[in-house]
Amino acid sequence: MASISGTMISTSFLPRKPAVTSLKAISNVGEALFGLKSGRNGRITCMASYKVKLITPEGPIEFECPDDVYILDQAEEEGHDLPYSCRAGSCSSCAGKVTAGSVDQSDGNFLDEDQEAAGFVLTCVAYPKGDVTIETHKEEELTA
């Protein structure tokens, strides 16, 4: 009900447009515009995406990497070749060194605390936690 100068007017006769009650109907739009993922049950999850800059011997490369994708996997998806062997964080083939930003590499078990504190990272088990710059091809420096 609405009131105009003390008179009550009913708005029930006005047509109503149907409202979207869930993002399930527009799941692709949600992901494209807002970085939202929608499962079959309509549950929405938010994912962040960060700028990753890799300094390789061939020159720097940059790409966007979601916070739930390993840096090595996203680099390969973008068409970049990086060294790797085990893809499980159990060797040093994919070693790099973080020069700016930070990563989550809690899935790996090869690096000790001192190596992680020195900035070493295994790109096969590293998720970006924000924009990050990594020097790649650091296996020799790590094992020296």
UniProtKB/Swiss-Prot annotation:
Keywords: 2Fe-2S, Chloroplast, Electron transport, Iron, Iron-sulfur, Metal-binding, Plastid, Transit peptide, Transport. It is found in: Plastid, Chloroplast. GO terms for molecular function: 2 iron, 2 sulfur cluster binding; electron transfer activity; metal ion binding. GO terms for biological process: electron transport chain; ferredoxin metabolic process. Residues 1-47 form a transit peptide. It comes from the Eukaryota. The keyword Methyltransferase does not apply. Belongs to the 2Fe2S plant-type ferredoxin family. This is Ferredoxin-1, chloroplastic. It comes from Solanum lycopersicum (Tomato). The lineage of its organism: Eukaryota, Viridiplantae, Streptophyta, Embryophyta, Tracheophyta. The gene is SEND33.
